[in-house]
């Protein structure tokens, strides 16, 4: 019995499913999850000492690599002064100022402790600001596990949303309209049906929870125009893409300006941090300035602020964003070339420091429907064969992969050598 297996069996006695977030259980790919003992740079080490090149990066935050000395020093030195105060600190001002300088659409920002808190709070703020109830989201996009966002499309061209999880009341879901990502007509239809009732539209600028689906040309700009036309707040959820697709986020990469932005992952440098921010006129409606309530015991935690400040300060150094994108492209194009060499039907999408792989006969994958038509069984075989060779990919065919600045040319070459063997087995 492996150490991971014994730990997993033990965990299931006291932790639901043996994990504290569902995707970690390997249900999407089968088998036993690997239990991690430590990480350094681009590598994970499991409880038996096996090394893996890591393309998950704690699901996105570890953009500098694991255990980066600058972040580690900031965390240790800050912790020596106290772990939490429940009072304002200079660090939270410094991080807020840095975020606003990097993301031009953000005039003011509120720190929270998770991406879910960020999206939940931004939507509440939009509803309070507009005095409307309905929201628009997109099928296949994930914005955390708040009740109003755990909603899927019903039957028909446009319906009121249906809960995607037990425990979400239908009365909550009915205020959420679910449209089709990369399909502006579906959004136009929603606004035409409820022209004076939609408080906001929230979108992942690159859909990273149906693997990696970039926006088609003009899609985000079309959403901006529709929100302007109907008086809805335009929210871009950059929890995954923020500082990763580009230093100013996907919004600067694609040239679109939201009213509100949600952040997470990279902004915490590996610590639990989220944030939402945007136009001053909207942000002034949040308490204590305005009537829309939002609070958090650990919001602005000094250790988390120090980690985020260290991470973003390092990331913004000249050449880092370009190198991250170059390494991602090198891996993505290398994988595609090897799949073609072995005649394995395969599509790879990539932008900035994130990528997605799809086993499919389709020429492109740019929609939720296209993702659902891909061969998940072949992905599962690829995942386990790569894992056996020391390459750790996301354990789900529907999750994006992440590059870090710690990944060397040698790491990518080793990954491609492993993929060459695995593609030959799949051919």
Curated annotation (Swiss-Prot):
Keywords: Cytoplasm, Isomerase, Porphyrin biosynthesis, Pyridoxal phosphate. Homodimer. One of its GO terms (molecular function) is glutamate-1-semialdehyde 2,1-aminomutase activity. This is Glutamate-1-semialdehyde 2,1-aminomutase. HAMAP family: HemL_aminotrans_3. The keyword Isomerase applies. PANTHER family: GLUTAMATE-1-SEMIALDEHYDE 2,1-AMINOMUTASE, GLUTAMATE-1-SEMIALDEHYDE 2,1-AMINOMUTASE 1, CHLOROPLASTIC-RELATED. CDD domains: OAT_like. Its cofactor is pyridoxal 5'-phosphate. Belongs to the class-III pyridoxal-phosphate-dependent aminotransferase family. HemL subfamily. InterPro entries: 4pyrrol_synth_GluAld_NH2Trfase, Aminotrans_3, Aminotrans_3_PPA_site, PyrdxlP-dep_Trfase, PyrdxlP-dep_Trfase_major, PyrdxlP-dep_Trfase_small. Signal peptide: none annotated. It comes from Pasteurella multocida (strain Pm70). One of its GO terms (cellular component) is cytoplasm. It catalyses: (S)-4-amino-5-oxopentanoate = 5-aminolevulinate. It is found in: Cytoplasm. It is an enzyme of class 5 (isomerase).
């Amino acid at each position: 019995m492996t150490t991971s297996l014994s730990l997993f069996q033990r965990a299931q006695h006291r932790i639901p499913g043996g994990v504290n977030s569902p995707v970690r259980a390997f249900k999407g790919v089968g088998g036993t999850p690997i239990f991690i003992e430590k990480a350094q740079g681009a590598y994970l080490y499991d409880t038996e000492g096996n090394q893996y090149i890591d393309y998950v990066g704690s699901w996105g935050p570890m953009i500098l690599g694991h255990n980066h000395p600058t972040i580690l020093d900031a965390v240790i030195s800050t912790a020596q002064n106290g772990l939490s105060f429940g009072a304002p600190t200079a660090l939270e001002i410094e991080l807020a100022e840095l975020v606003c300088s990097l993301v031009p659409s953000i005039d003011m920002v509120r720190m929270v402790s998770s991406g879910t808190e960020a999206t939940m709070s931004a939507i509440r703020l939009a509803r309070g600001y507009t005095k409307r109830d309905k929201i628009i989201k997109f099928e296949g996009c994930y914005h955390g596990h708040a009740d109003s966002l755990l909603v899927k499309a019903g039957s028909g061209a446009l319906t009121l949303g249906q809960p995607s999880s037990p425990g979400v009341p239908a009365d909550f879901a009915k205020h959420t309209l679910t449209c089709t990502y990369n399909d502006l007509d579906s959004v136009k239809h929603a606004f035409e049906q409820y022209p004076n009732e939609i408080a906001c539209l929230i979108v992942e600028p690159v859909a990273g929870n149906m693997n990696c689906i970039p926006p088609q040309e003009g899609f985000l700009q079309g959403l901006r125009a529709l929100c302007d036309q109907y008086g809805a707040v335009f929210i871009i959820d950059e929890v995954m893409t923020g500082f990763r697709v580009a230093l100013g986020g996907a919004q600067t990469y694609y040239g679109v300006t939201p009213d509100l932005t949600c952040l997470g992952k990279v902004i915490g440098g590996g610590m639990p941090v989220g944030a939402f921010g945007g136009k001053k006129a909207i942000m002034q409606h949040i308490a204590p300035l305005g009537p829309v309530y939002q609070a958090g015991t650990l919001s602005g935690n000094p250790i988390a602020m120090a980690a985020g400040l260290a991470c973003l300060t390092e990331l913004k150094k000249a050449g880092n964003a370009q190198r991250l994108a170059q390494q991602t492209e090198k891996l993505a194009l290398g994988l595609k070339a090897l799949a073609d060499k072995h005649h394995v039907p395969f599509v790879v999408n990539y932008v900035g420091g994130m990528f997605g792989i799809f086993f499919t006969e389709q020429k492109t994958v740019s929609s939720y429907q296209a993702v659902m038509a891909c061969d998940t069984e072949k992905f599962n075989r690829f995942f386990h064969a790569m894992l056996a060779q020391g390459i750790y990919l996301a354990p789900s065919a529907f999750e994006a992969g992440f590059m870090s600045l710690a990944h060397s040319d040698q790491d990518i070459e080793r990954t491609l050598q492993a993929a060459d063997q695995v593609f030959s087995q799949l051919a």
